[in-house]
């Protein structure tokens, strides 16, 4: 078992991570010494920690170059969880194409690089950057708002972003999303998440408002999410933690909306108490 662990956050996120009190309490019960540390605190000597765990560093999309440099610096002196290769894979949602090529069902997605015109499917659409977190700079548009969606794409392109265009699935308003949490590659627990994406606007906070609830995953949901985690494990190594967000597509099947390996909320507050203990165990050993 390790002796000392850094739980990595950022100043703006302090007090806003629902996982934090449950995770820290569970880690304390293992006997591990835990420090709550901002990732961009230059006074920190990361080599003093046996393990550094990314948790609520939610401002990284706005500081990506700095964050990337930090990943390598920490990884050079201690055990970073998840490792940089996994983090970098998950940073860019163009990984959805890789999942689709491997036969994992994904939300229908068109990737629009800077310099390319955007085209939209009939009906409502969602526009989001390929690199982002917490639904920041993501927005939904109605069937009569494609002009506004085009302007949104142009703004993201001007910032150098590849853009994802997805249909606004009929199931989203009624059912939301299902975050599926995996620890050491094995399914742990699930939740239900309903994200309030702005209508023809963008999120200007660390994350979009959410309404969350407990959820008992079905075998079909676990199968799809496990396929995504297995692909990552086979190609890059097994993530200590992973969250696969599922939605129901317009044919009624479950598909992957995203795979979060950077600093995902794990919805410990909506899971059985043993979930926090499982999380602490994989971090401590």
Language model regions located:
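Active-site nucleotide/adenylate-binding loops and adjacent lid/helix of ATP-dependent enzymes
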Residues: 2-9, 71-76, 85-175, 219-223, ...
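A short glycine-rich, hydrophobically flanked beta-strand micro-motif that places a catalytic Asp/Glu
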Residues: 35, 165-167, 237-250
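Short secondary-structure junctions
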Residues: 32, 104-105, 121-122, 234-240
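Glycine-rich phosphate/pyrophosphate-binding beta-alpha loops
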Residues: 58, 135, 196-198, 260-270
């Amino acid at each position: 078992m390790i002796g000392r662990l850094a739980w990595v956050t950022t100043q703006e996120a302090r007090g806003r991570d629902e996982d934090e009190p449950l995770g820290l309490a569970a880690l304390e019960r293992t006997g591990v010494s835990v420090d709550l540390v901002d990732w961009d605190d230059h006074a920190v000597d990361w080599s003093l920690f046996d393990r550094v765990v990314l948790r609520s560093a939610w401002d990284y999309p706005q500081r990506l170059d700095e964050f990337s440099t930090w990943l390598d610096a920490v990884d050079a002196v201690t055990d970073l969880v998840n490792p940089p290769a996994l983090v970098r894979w998950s940073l860019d949602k163009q990984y959805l194409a890789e999942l689709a090529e491997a036969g994992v069902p994904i939300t229908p997605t068109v990737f629009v690089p800077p310099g390319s015109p955007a085209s939209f499917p009939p009906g409502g659409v969602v526009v989001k950057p390929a690199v982002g977190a917490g639904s920041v700079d993501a927005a939904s548009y109605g069937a009569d708002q494609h002009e506004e969606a085009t302007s949104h794409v142009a703004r993201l392109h001007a910032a150098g972003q590849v853009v994802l265009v997805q249909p606004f699935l009929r199931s989203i308003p009624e059912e939301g999303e299902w975050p599926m949490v995996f620890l050491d590659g094995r399914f742990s627990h699930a939740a239900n998440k309903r994200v309030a994406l702005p209508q023809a606007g963008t999120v200007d906070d660390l994350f979009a408002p959410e309404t969350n609830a407990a959820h008992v995953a079905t075998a079909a949901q676990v199968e799809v999410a496990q396929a995504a985690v297995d692909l990552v494990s086979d190609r890059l190594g097994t993530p200590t933690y992973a969250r696969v967000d599922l939605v129901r597509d317009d044919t009624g099947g479950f598909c992957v909306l995203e795979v979060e390996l950077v600093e995902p909320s794990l919805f410990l507050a909506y899971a059985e108490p043993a979930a926090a203990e499982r999380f602490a165990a994989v971090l401590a050993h």
